[in-house]
């Protein structure tokens, strides 16, 4: 069984990896993937803490996190598909320019 420290440390590394990628990347698809990595890191932390305290609350919260991530990803991918069809790019710097 994984210890509390190792599980939370792995979760922290995943969260920092997702946050760094969120800040550095300029492609909206990679930003969405970074958000998914961050949500999975939070879910891992919930499961590790729940397992450490022998409570099922962490696993129940993780089900909610998975549900939130799935709905967020499906809506965001549908919006990205429409955005790409209209603008032919997913670069956030180009999309943020105002056209007048």
From Swiss-Prot:
Cell compartment(s), UniProt: Cell membrane
GO terms classed as biological process: ATP synthesis coupled electron transport
A family per Pfam: Oxidored_q2
Transmembrane portions of the chain: 4-24, 28-48, 60-80
Bilayer disposition of the protein: Multi-pass membrane protein
Domain of life: Bacteria
Keywords: Cell membrane, Membrane, NAD, Quinone, Translocase, Transmembrane, Transmembrane helix, Transport, Ubiquinone
Catalytic activity: a quinone + NADH + 5 H(+)(in) = a quinol + NAD(+) + 4 H(+)(out)
GO MF terms held by the record: NADH:ubiquinone reductase (non-electrogenic) activity; quinone binding
Major place of residence: membrane
Documented EC number(s): 7.1.1.-
GO annotation, cellular component aspect: NADH dehydrogenase complex; plasma membrane
Enzyme class: translocase
InterPro entries, sorted: NADH_UbQ_OxRdtase_chain4L/K, NUOK/Mnh_C1-like
Name this polypeptide is given: NADH-quinone oxidoreductase subunit K
């Amino acid at each position: 069984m994984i210890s509390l420290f190792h599980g939370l440390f792995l979760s922290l590394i995943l969260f920092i990896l997702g946050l760094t990628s969120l800040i550095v990347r300029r492609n909206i698809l990679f930003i969405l993937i970074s958000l998914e990595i961050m949500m999975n890191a939070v879910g891992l932390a919930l499961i590790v803490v729940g397992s450490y305290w022998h409570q099922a609350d962490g696993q129940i919260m993780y089900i909610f996190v998975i549900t939130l991530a799935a709905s967020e990803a499906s809506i965001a991918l549908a919006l990205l598909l429409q955005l790409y069809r209209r603008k032919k790019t997913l670069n956030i710097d180009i999309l943020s320019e105002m056209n007048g």
